[in-house]
Amino acid sequence: MTTLAIDIGGTKLAAALIDNNLRISQRRELPTPASKTPDALREALKALVEPLRAEARQVAIASTGIIQEGMLLALNPHNLGGLLHFPLVQTLETIAGLPTLAVNDAQAAAWAEYHALPDDIRDMVFITVSTGVGGGVVCDGKLLTGKGGLAGHLGHTLADPHGPVCGCGRVGCVEAIASGRGMAAAARDDLAGCDAKTLFIRAGEGHQQARHLVSQSAQVIARMIADVKATTDCQCVVIGGSVGLAEGYLEQVRAFLMQEPAPYHVALSAARYRHDAGLLGAALLAQGDTL
């Protein structure tokens, strides 16, 4: 059965047809509407999926934010602007005329990455370190989403009670320190205004402050992984995202994790599917795996 998979991100919308063998075809992308209004998103989604819907039998959505009863929510409502409580599932069912499911994008990515692991892995955690920090948890072969869709939002666990205020309202969240946005916000002097990509370039050139910001991010993620190991006893952790997959970053995380006591050690690996993980994970869920 062919699935029309859609990935709704902060900067772009992606859609593709995916068959039961996870082959992707006719991938399309559009920028996410800057206005963040229901009408703008509705029209963008319509333009995105109209050329694809005739060949699909169902729709699967991976979206930023929290998906609760088919509606779009967020820990930081300001991120969604006028899209808070946007009826995501209902909107796509109307546009495509097909049965639709929706899941958080990091949860979807976790499900895709889980299916790429050896069969003896039943418990894994996926962590994406990018503009923000997100995640997904698979326990005994089942994806955890939670009644309210909150499961796996690991970026909003505590890193430093005296740290910066996070967009969710808490103080010292992992995301506020370790994410690309958090690193950029902490940059000072000649690095002020630099984005995470630039910080990694400067760190590679030996810039002391840039190296510290990257190292601090890796250490915070490593400590979070130790907490995750203690909470889930997962067999492995898969790391993705633009920061997580940046050159040398995973090695730093692994080195910091090895400084933790042995019971908190866990195998780390880089994400396999990268920017297709959300599309593939959502399609897998629609193709018979239930939430």
Curated annotation (Swiss-Prot):
User: Which InterPro entries would you find in this protein's record?
Assistant: ATPase_NBD, ManNAc_kinase_bac, ROK, ROK_cs
Question: Where is Zn(2+) bound in this sequence?
Answer: H156, C166, C168, C173
Q: Which UniProt keywords apply?
A: ATP-binding, Carbohydrate metabolism, Kinase, Metal-binding, Nucleotide-binding, Transferase, Zinc
Q: State the source organism's domain of life.
A: Bacteria
Which Pfam families does the record associate with it? ROK
Q: GO terms for biological process?
A: N-acetylneuraminate catabolic process
Does Metal-binding appear among the keywords? yes
| Top-level enzyme category | transferase
Q: Binding of ATP: at which residues? A: 5-12, 132-139
Q: Which reaction does it catalyse?
A: an N-acyl-D-mannosamine + ATP = an N-acyl-D-mannosamine 6-phosphate + ADP + H(+)
The disulfides recorded in the entry are: none
Molecular functions per Gene Ontology:
ATP binding; N-acylmannosamine kinase activity; zinc ion binding
Instruction: Quote the pathway field.
Output: Amino-sugar metabolism; N-acetylneuraminate degradation; D-fructose 6-phosphate from N-acetylneuraminate: step 2/5
Q: What is its EC number?
A: 2.7.1.60
**Quaternary structure annotation from Swiss-Prot or TrEMBL:** Homodimer.
Q: Which family does it belong to?
A: Belongs to the ROK (NagC/XylR) family. NanK subfamily.
What is this protein's function? Catalyzes the phosphorylation of N-acetylmannosamine (ManNAc) to ManNAc-6-P.
* Protein name per the record: N-acetylmannosamine kinase
